């Protein structure tokens, strides 16, 4: 018997295409677009499953597994070496001045955010991935912080790439909260404004 290979219109329309657009603190007054980027953006969600051992067990058993840990991350390479991008790559770094006059120094050893500096964690990192039907998958990770190493290379006939590996974090006040959210939106993120209330005026 021949296997049916035809695709439905919905299957075609929901194919994700092209690179993603990434925003820091999307929908907040501090919203900004990341980049320019190279190589697109990659979201990953990982759960650590544990099988409950019991007498008579012969293999994996439905209802006898727990989730011990959840992780969510977004990876993206930025070509921008602005102070804002470097601060994102160096959580907890010490900054004096602003803009082109900013001076950035290493973070002090110790507990991050122990002094109440909220800038260590971004409110959110949001990626928009375009679908064939013109809509977008909007993927948001919460309380994002880069945990990758910063490398800056000056190479002839090449551009430096800042590799960001941003992980979502729970908060101490909500240890079972949301790490990420995936939804479908029709709005073109290129038309996004810093304060969403401005769109209503």
What name fits each language-model region?
Residues 79-81, 128-135, 171:
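Short, flexible beta-strand-to-coil junctions
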Residues 137-201:
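Mixed-charge, glycine-accented linear interaction segment located at domain edges/termini
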Residues 89-91, 95-132:
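Extended, positively charged loop/linker patches that create polyanion-binding surfaces
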Residues 22-24, 125-127, 182:
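Hydrophobic beta-strand residues in large extracellular and virion-surface proteins
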Residues 73-77, 124-128, 163-167:
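Beta-strand secondary-structure signal
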Residues 2-88, 143-161:
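Solvent-exposed edge beta-strands and adjacent loop segments
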Residues 31, 135-138:
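Short, mixed charged/polar active-site loops
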Residues 64-66, 82-86, 115-122, 164-172, ...:
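Noncatalytic linker/hinge segments flanking ATPase motor cores
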């Amino acid at each position: 018997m021949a296997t049916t290979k035809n695709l439905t219109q919905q299957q075609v329309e929901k194919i994700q295409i092209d690179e993603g657009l990434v925003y820091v603190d999307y929908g907040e007054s501090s919203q900004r677009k990341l980049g320019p980027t190279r190589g697109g953006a990659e979201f990953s969600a990982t759960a650590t499953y544990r099988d409950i051992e019991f007498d008579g067990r012969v293999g994996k058993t439905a209802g006898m597994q727990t989730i011990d840990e959840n992780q969510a991350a977004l990876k993206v390479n930025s070509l921008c070496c602005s102070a804002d991008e470097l601060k994102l790559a160096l959580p907890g770094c010490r900054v004096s001045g602003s803009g082109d006059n900013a001076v950035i120094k290493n973070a002090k050893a110790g507990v991050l955010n122990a002094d109440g500096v909220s800038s260590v964690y971004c409110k959110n990192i949001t990626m928009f991935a375009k679908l064939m039907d013109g809509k977008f998958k909007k993927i948001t990770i919460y309380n994002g912080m880069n945990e990758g190493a910063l490398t800056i290379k000056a190479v002839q006939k090449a551009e430096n790439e800042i590799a960001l590996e941003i992980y979502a974090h729970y908060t101490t006040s909500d240890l079972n909260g949301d790490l990420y959210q995936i939804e479908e939106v029709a709005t073109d993120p290129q038309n996004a404004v810093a304060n969403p209330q401005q769109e209503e005026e």
